[in-house]
Amino acid sequence: MKITTKVLIIGSGPAGLSAAIYTARSALKPILINGMQPGGQLTMTTDVENYPGFAETIQGPWLMEQMSMQAKNVGTEIISDYVERVDLSKRPFKIFTGTGNEYEADSIIICTGAESKWLGIASEQEFRGFGVSSCAICDGFFFKNQEIVVVGGGNSALEEALYLTNHANKVTVVHRRNSFRAEKILQDRLFKNPKISVIWDHIIDEIVGSNKPKAVTGVKIQNVYTNEINLVNCSGVFIAIGHAPNTALFKGQIAIDDDNYIVTQSGSTRTNVEGVFAAGDVQDKIYRQAVTAAASGCMAALEVAKFLNK
């Protein structure tokens, strides 16, 4: 089936739903394709305490459900589908979905987000949300006065480790090399922090824990040279080996930087293709917060309205 629309939004995280709310209120009748993970990364977060407007802790899935309902109530058509292919070579742009539908859109807002890179071991998946996390700001509070392991050696890992010392008694950074890639200033801060210790030349072999209640109790680490395995006791494991923006669909059709983020013009959500806009973590390598994603979704919607009214 071929469907035409003025605005098509790809992705249903805070950026996509914010863009939907604003374009709908501009009477543009947007269509939003919610993707493989409706609601985005927040659906993987149980307790949300840093989104403005809520005095008490809220649940990530609940917040995204509320945003989705709000978008629908103001006139957004939300489609349960995923995008397989796009053609951005000319307007109207063409979008092909997994269910076989074809959309033609005068403008597109890309809000496909970015996913945390994971270790790829079975135990990591088993305890995700039960002691395994990739967001210290989101989940660090729940490990107050406990021991935590951070995995990684770049800026993200060191920033996470330093932040977690606000909550944890002890933070152990496990890194597969014998030096960090992170900026020198971050390394200096980390080495001076009495709560942080570093284990070099090790990888995570297994995350161990209990089932009743389901919780992490430690990690087995493996020396990359000797293969010797040791146990480090901890209550939480934070994976900080980087983020991977979901931009594979758009490669070769739109400007993407060396880190695979969509390039937008300074102070704008406009891309190098007229009529195509990008918002949220798919183009934001610095902040990566729900509130900043929602804000950029609003920006994209306002810019789309201006573009279509030329």
UniProtKB/Swiss-Prot annotation:
> Where does this protein hold FAD?
34-41, 281-290
Q: Which UniProt keywords apply?
A: Cytoplasm, Disulfide bond, FAD, Flavoprotein, NADP, Oxidoreductase, Redox-active center
Identify the EC number(s): 1.8.1.9
List residues traversing the bilayer. none
Give the matching SUPFAM superfamilies.
Answer: FAD/NAD(P)-binding domain
Q: Which locations, inside or outside the cell, does it occupy?
A: Cytoplasm
Q: Catalysed reaction per UniProt?
A: [thioredoxin]-dithiol + NADP(+) = [thioredoxin]-disulfide + NADPH + H(+)
What biological process terms from GO does the record include? removal of superoxide radicals
Q: Which GO terms describe its molecular function?
A: thioredoxin-disulfide reductase (NADPH) activity
Subunit structure, briefly?
Homodimer.
More info:
The active site is a redox-active disulfide bond.
The Swiss-Prot or TrEMBL record describes its family as follows: Belongs to the class-II pyridine nucleotide-disulfide oxidoreductase family.
**Protein name per the record:** Thioredoxin reductase
Q: Gene encoding it?
A: trxB
